[in-house]
Structure formats: structure tokens, C-alpha cells
């Protein structure tokens, strides 16, 4: 069984029910290990065939020892009906030879584990052999680490046995003085975080030789924002950080203390009256303090996210509650372009192979935006399915077309941007899987995601889909090859 809805149907069954039209299919795959010989020509099949029968046909042609469940794309769209229904719906003649791409069928991501915290979990990241932070070093299987940030003001490092092996210092020992909103691994030995205390912080991460214990030590405090710093991103090779703040600005920083200017005196804890008590508690810890390389002030509402271009670290993108996505030249600090959507933009992820930016909105959908100046429309595609704000996004590490989103509706949804339909509002995408919070149990969905809002999500090839939220949980889901790869070799 391959878990998809349509049942067994072969050519003989289809043709015995009633006379069928026939159509020629040119079957191709982008994967050499499952590709048919180049000499394979168009194949004449009944138009009544559905996915299951086509999958059986391809397996027979491949002479597979063990059947492989396949999905089929025609003109970039997954076949979800019979071929006949597809032809009728799209006004295509059965005399046409259809180019049909086949890919391995999707595998549902199953729940693997949940890690309980003391408070809401605002952010998660992964250190593994396949993560960006771990790509330059060797992280053995089973030695992966999960970083979490919480509303209790602390960072935690977890092993894969759900044990906390490191905890960041409390405020009086150089830690955050309010809730942490975001945290990311820079490398196996460095962490960055930001939060409601208006700071961006760098930490040194050190593990014992046996890996059973570790430490998170403050290295650098970065001051410049006048509001909560809700999102940060990192480009390790250039040692640069981008931050998104509720003060309407985007911060640009260096992880190197010597490259940052002095911190603005007016923003230091010692010069803010409301922080005097906290400063006394911190008096025993001395952490270097620096300011930003630049603050970009063009947005007219809180900035929700800021990221580097995945292929060019001199370009940055930011999204905001002011409905705009802005493109920045990080070398000159100038605003290059502004794209204005219909709703507040709350999250962003780059899909460079498609020249698109995915942005989650307050209107419960994801809009795919082409940031290039030559683009004639703002939204190239809309992904619908969530029932509350979409606050976090992550790319599928294996597929050019894959994306996962996290929402305040209490679910994560997996998307393949090739899975689309056209209606009166244009081209729409529909999610392939919805991942509920395990903490809900058998109670089903909660209205508006009450108590189980998702705050962050990370998709790692080794560990799986790691999400966090209002239920005080890190949740790990895994499905081998959740999406078929469509643009690069694994």
C-alpha cells in the first residue's frame, strides 16, 4: 500500500467497464535511478487510468523487484483524477501526446518525539551533518543537536534522547533579560539569539568530550534596536547578521566584535532607568557591547522577518506588517525595491531556484513573490489551507519545490508549489500534508489554534521537521523523502 486514496486499477479493468478513449504518454523522470531507457517511446494507454494504474505501469516498464509508488505531473500539476477527467478539465485533445513526469510518491511525516519546556517555545534550529551550521564539520548520526528558545528567557540545547545538555545563563549571569524570540546556530560552536529585551546576542557553545554536557556562554551583546527583535538570520561566511524589529527597522551586524561600532550609549542597560535593577543583577558579568553596522529604516510598521538572499549575501529581504517586502543592497545600505501585498507579511523564505520568495501572511495564506524588478505581478502563486496567521516558513532540504509553513492555527503544512489549481482568484496551491500538534491528542483541531499555536519550524534532512509553539513543546516529525526532488540530486 502507498497511502494514496485511489484504489487498484489496471488497463484491463478500465477498458472492460466501458469503451475508453486512448492517449499517448511520454513518461520521463529527472532521477537516473528510476528513469526509463531513452529508447522508450510514447505509450498508448486508456484515458480512464488513474495514478495507481499508471504507477503499476511504470513499475512494470522498470521491471522493479519491489514496487515503487509514483506520482505523476502533467504540465507541472499533480494528476489527482483520471487522465480523461484531466483532459476534459484542461481542454486538451486525446490526440495530443502528453509529457508526463513521474516522481516517487509522497510519504507522510510521522511523529517521532516531543520535548517539553517550562514555557512557550518561540524558536528552534538544528545542528546536523546536513544543516547549514553543521555543513563545515562532521556531526555523526545520533549526535545531532536541537537548539530552542523560550519565553522564559533561556536557550536550551537538546540531544536526540530529549535531554537538555546545555542551558543559557539567567539574566543576572549575562543572559537575556526578557523572553527570547529567535535563536539560530551559526556554527557548531556559536549561537545567535534575539528577544523582547531589544538585543541580539552571540554565544559560545562548547560540549564535553563525551557529549553528555555542554555550556552556552555569552560572547557579545548587540544594541541598536528600540523594540523587540523578533527575527534574525545569519550568513556565516561573511559573518553578517540581519535582524527584524518591532521598531520598524532592519538591523545589520557582524559576529566579529572588532567590526561593529560602539553601542549607542542611550540604549545600554546602565542608561535606561527601567533596567537599573537588572543591571545590578548583571554587575558580576562583563560582556562586550557593540552597535550595528547599519539600521535600515524604510518600513512603516513592525518588521516581521529579514533574510539574506540564498545565493548572494550582499542582498537582503525584509517583510513587515506594513504589507511590504523590501529588497536591500547590503553593501550600500540602499533600498532597491518594494513589493506591496494586500495583507501584513509575517514570515519569509527564499526559493532561489524558482526566483521566488515565499511569505506567510496575516490573511492565513502564503504568497509567492517574484522580487525581480522585471516581474510584472506581485504574487506569482497563492498557497491556501491555513486557518490562522502563517508566522514561519522553511524550505524542504531535498526539493526545489518543497516548503513547510507553521501557523497560529496549530498546524504545520507541507507544500509542493507544483501542486496547483486555477480558480476565479488565479493560480492556487493546496497543501499536501497537514501536521497537527501531538499535544492535542485525540481532541482534534482547536479553534484558532488556541493553546497550540506554532511559532517556528525548521526542516532538516537528517533530523526531520522540527517545530515549536504555544504548547511548550518541540515536536519532531519525519518522513523519508517527504517530497520528490525536482531540481537537484540528493
Curated annotation (Swiss-Prot):
Keywords: Nucleus, Repeat, Ribosome biogenesis, rRNA processing, WD repeat. InterPro entries: G-protein_beta_WD-40_rep, NLE, WD40/YVTN_repeat-like_dom_sf, WD40_repeat_CS, WD40_repeat_dom_sf, WD40_rpt, WDR12/Ytm1. It comes from the Eukaryota. Residues 23-104 are annotated as: Ubiquitin-like (UBL) domain. CDD domains: WD40. One of its GO terms (molecular function) is ribonucleoprotein complex binding. One of its GO terms (cellular component) is PeBoW complex. One of its GO terms (biological process) is maturation of 5.8S rRNA from tricistronic rRNA transcript (SSU-rRNA, 5.8S rRNA, LSU-rRNA). Signal peptide: none annotated. WD repeats lie at residues 116-168, 175-213, 224-263, 298-338, 340-379, 385-425, 449-487. Residues 1-22, 255-286 are annotated as: Disordered. Pfam families: NLE (PF08154), WD40 (PF00400). It is found in: Nucleus, Nucleolus; Nucleus, Nucleoplasm. Component of the NOP7 complex, composed of ERB1, NOP7 and YTM1. The complex is held together by ERB1, which interacts with NOP7 via its N-terminal domain and with YTM1 via a high-affinity interaction between the seven-bladed beta-propeller domains of the 2 proteins. The NOP7 complex associates with the 66S pre-ribosome. Interacts (via UBL domain) with MDN1 (via VWFA/MIDAS domain). Component of the NOP7 complex, which is required for maturation of the 25S and 5.8S ribosomal RNAs and formation of the 60S ribosome. Belongs to the WD repeat WDR12/YTM1 family. This is Ribosome biogenesis protein YTM1. It comes from Ajellomyces capsulatus (strain NAm1 / WU24) (Darling's disease fungus). The gene is YTM1.
Amino acid at each position: 500500500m502507498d497511502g494514496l486514496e485511489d484504489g487498484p486499477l489496471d488497463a484491463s479493468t478500465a477498458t472492460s467497464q466501458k469503451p475508453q478513449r486512448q492517449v499517448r504518454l511520454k513518461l520521463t523522470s529527472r532521477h537516473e535511478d528510476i528513469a526509463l531507457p531513452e529508447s522508450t517511446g510514447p505509450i498508448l494507454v486508456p484515458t480512464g487510468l488513474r495514478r495507481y494504474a499508471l504507477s503499476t505501469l511504470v513499475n512494470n516498464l522498470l521491471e522493479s523487484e519491489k514496487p515503487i509508488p509514483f506520482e505523476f505531473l502533467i504540465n507541472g500539476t499533480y494528476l489527482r483524477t483520471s487522465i480523461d477527467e484531466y483532459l476534459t478539465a484542461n481542454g486538451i485533445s486525446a490526440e495530443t501526446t502528453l509529457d508526463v513526469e513521474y516522481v516517487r510518491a509522497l510519504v507522510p511525516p510521522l511523529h517521532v518525539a516531543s520535548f517539553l519546556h517550562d514555557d512557550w517555545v518561540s524558536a528552534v534550529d538544528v545542528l546536523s551533518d546536513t544543516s547549514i551550521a553543521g555543513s563545515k564539520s562532521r556531526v555523526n548520526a545520533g549526535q545531532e543537536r536541537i537548539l530552542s528558545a523560550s519565553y522564559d528567557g533561556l536557550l536550551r540545547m537538546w540531544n536526540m534522547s530529549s535531554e537538555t545538555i546545555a542551558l543559557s545563563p539567567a539574566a543576572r549571569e549575562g543572559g537575556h533579560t526578557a523572553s527570547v524570540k529567535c535563536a539560530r546556530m551559526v556554527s557548531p560552536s556559536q549561537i545567535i539569539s534575539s528577544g523582547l529585551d531589544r538585543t541580539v546576542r552571540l554565544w559560545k557553545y562548547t560540549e564535553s568530550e563525551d557529549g553528555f554536557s555542554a555550556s552556552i556562554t555569552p560572547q557579545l551583546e548587540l544594541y541598536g534596536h528600540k523594540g523587540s527583535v523578533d527575527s534574525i538570520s545569519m550568513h556565516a561566511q561573511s559573518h553578517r547578521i540581519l535582524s527584524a524589529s518591532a521598531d520598524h527597522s532592519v538591523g545589520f551586524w557582524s559576529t566579529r566584535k572588532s567590526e561593529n561600532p560602539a553601542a549607542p550609549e542611550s540604549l545600554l542597560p546602565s542608561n535606561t532607568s527601567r533596567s537599573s535593577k537588572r543591571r545590578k543583577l548583571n554587575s558580576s558579568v562583563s560582556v562586550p557591547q557593540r552597535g550595528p553596522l547599519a539600521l535600515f529604516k524604510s518600513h512603516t510598521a513592525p518588521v516581521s522577518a529579514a533574510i539574506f538572499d540564498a545565493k548572494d549575501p550582499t542582498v537582503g529581504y525584509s517583510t513587515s506588517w506594513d504589507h511590504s517586502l523590501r529588497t536591500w543592497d547590503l553593501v550600500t545600505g540602499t533600498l532597491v525595491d518594494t513589493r506591496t501585498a494586500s495583507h501584513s507579511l509575517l514570515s519569509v523564505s527564499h526559493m532561489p531556484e524558482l526566483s521566488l520568495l515565499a511569505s506567510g501572511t496575516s490573511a492565513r495564506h502564503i504568497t509567492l513573490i517574484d522580487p525581480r524588478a522585471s516581474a510584472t505581478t506581485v504574487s506569482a502563486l497563492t498557497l491556501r489551507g491555513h486557518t490562522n496567521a502563517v508566522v514561519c516558513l522553511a524550505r524542504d532540504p531535498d526539493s526545489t519545490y518543497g516548503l513547510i509553513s507553521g501557523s497560529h492555527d496549530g498546524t504545520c503544512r507541507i507544500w509542493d508549489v507544483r501542486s496547483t489549481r486555477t480558480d476565479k482568484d488565479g493560480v492556487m496551491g493546496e497543501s499536501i500534508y497537514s501536521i497537527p500538534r501531538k499535544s492535542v491528542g485525540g481532541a482534534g483541531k482547536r479553534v484558532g489554534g488556541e493553546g497550540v499555536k506554532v511559532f517556528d519550524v525548521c526542516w532538516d534532512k537528517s533530523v526531520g521537521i522540527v517545530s515549536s509553539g504555544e504548547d511548550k513543546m518541540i515536536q519532531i516529525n519525519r518522513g523519508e523523502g517527504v517530497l520528490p526532488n525536482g531540481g537537484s540530486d540528493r
